[in-house]
Amino acid sequence: MRQKTRRILLLVSLLLFPVTLNFFSPYVSIDGAMAGVASGSLLLFVALAVGAVFFGRAWCAWACPMGGLAEYGRAVNDRPVKRKPLAVLRYSIFGVWGAFVALGFLMAGGVKGFDPLRLTENLVSVDEPVKYITYYLVLAVFVVLTLAVGRRGACHAICWMSPFMAVGYVAGRWLGIPQLRIVSEPGKCTDCGSCDRRCPMSLPVSSLHKRGAVRVSDCILCGECVDHCPKKALRYGVRGR
């Protein structure tokens, strides 16, 4: 039931993507920065970072519109991915984008205000035919990468939001703030590998949980490992550092 609910939430988020696209747009953040204002997308990215202090990357599994595409892409290509090379690419993209945002604010003389509806004055991102080009291009990039690379391939390779949440998660852990995590009773584990096979992020859950909890920023708290563990060795819980 939990996984069905999660997939329904992701589907709803995906269907709403024509409305919400600009709030996830890295371009809108740069456009706002060049005008000296924090746009809705930049404010959302910061909010995701703050939320990750307490909830890690749960957003990715339960609410991200592109997460919906990734979930359904597994039906075509469920191959585990090599996380480290893709992480280098993802953080490189994030670094370049962050540099443009910083440069934009610098050229504008700093942050002069906030504009949550920048480029979205009608409250709908895709509000005229020409904007469908951007919309379908974004969808195409995520679909192609997901199908070509494997499990959540686009998330691993190009997602510009996940670094914000990774920073929030690491900050929360470093500060010892109680965080939602996948916790375990290692004594119940029989090393059957079910959790590894089910993990959409290609994490080696069977080894990560042996210290009592999964403590990595790539865990998106989807609960696949929890719901498919035959020995009920895994569950959701709150842990500090």
What are these model-derived regions, one by one?
Residues 1-220, 224-241:
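Non-ligating segments of multi-cofactor redox enzymes
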